[in-house]
Amino acid sequence: ERLRLCELAFPDADVTPMELRREGKSYTVDTLREISRGNPGAELYFLVGTDMLLYMEQWYEFRALFSLCTLAALPRADGDLAEIERYAAYLRKTYGARIEIIAKTPLPMDSTALRAALPRRGGADRLCDAVYSEIIRCRLYGAKPDLAWLRGKTDAYLKPTRIPHVRGCEETAARLALRWGEDPEDAAEAGILHDITKRLSDDEQLRLAEKYGIVLN
């Protein structure tokens, strides 16, 4: 699933599954060697964040890694740039490492926090639409859709005259859920989705029911 998400996130890049195919322990230096063998003469760049750069000396065969690529270091948080510059200077002097610093405004994000946000209907503002859509489609990481995002997606499947009705159902469902002690956001999601197939023909609806194993009388 992560391979598929990478392909969606970087449509213009060649995303390789070589590390998934590799048996046993897999190290970054092995991947760089394999890429280098397959692309003789190519200049390789390895994108790293502050947290990775500061612990490079603990990486497996880090000296060989330095010889195979240029490190492209990105700050992960405000205030990281000065620390990156100091440590990069040390690695250059001590090991002859090639390091380029990408002085961009950091986007505070970590994968653990992002995965934790997805079941709480967060994350849509941190991910490209293709990736977020796939996560919601497959319900990866227990994700629940951001309701504003879901409205934007479902409105395209509704006649304009149907949208006010759907909004009313969403609001009523949320109020009733609160009244009876249920999750109002889950109820709102059901309200948003309840008319999603209205524009489909009868044959299209039957095919959809068959696809999802819905038995019709």
List PLM regions with ranges.
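Amphipathic alpha-helical interaction segments
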Residues: 130-133, 168-171, 191
